UniProtKB/Swiss-Prot annotation:
Its main location: membrane. This is Bactoprenol-linked glucose translocase. GO terms for biological process: lipopolysaccharide biosynthetic process. It is found in: Cell membrane. The gene is rfbI. Involved in O antigen modification. Involved in the translocation of bactoprenol-linked glucose across the cytoplasmic membrane. PANTHER family: PROPHAGE BACTOPRENOL-LINKED GLUCOSE TRANSLOCASE HOMOLOG (PTHR38459:SF1).
Length: 124
């Protein structure tokens, strides 16, 4: 039982919960850009990412890692995760893969890599 309690108070659990909201925001913006504005997957993914990542950055700085949200940290986070987001979208466009596959794959990949980058580099 102690392990479950520790997990529920860990920075990863907080990061995961914020990630759920982030994912809903990202997917909603992606959908609107892709279907209503006729953006490609690359552009749709980066726009959705920027909206969601801005929310996540401030929420994670405060709740998950308990550090100040500086401009330098914000730009490092946005650049790192944004480049990854855009590359996923462009690659999946080139491979003619479904937009939903782009969203699922990027969401899973960004949860793991994003947490590691945030914990050990961006918010240290």
């Amino acid at each position: 039982m102690l392990k479950i309690g520790k997990l529920l108070t860990s920075s990863f659990f907080s990061y995961f919960l914020i990630g759920i909201v982030n994912t809903a925001l990202h997917w909603g913006v992606f959908y609107a850009c892709y279907n209503n504005l006729a953006f490609g997957q690359g552009r749709s993914n980066i726009v959705g990412f920027i909206c969601a990542a801005t929310f996540s950055f401030f929420a994670n700085a405060r709740c998950s890692f308990k550090v100040s949200a500086t401009k330098a940290r914000y730009f490092i986070f946005i650049f790192f995760m944004g480049a990854m987001s855009y590359l996923f979208g462009v690659l999946f466009d080139l491979l003619a893969l479904s937009p939903i596959f782009t969203l699922f794959t990027f969401s899973l990949f960004s949860l793991v890599l994003g947490y590691c980058a945030s914990k050990y580099f961006i918010f240290r």
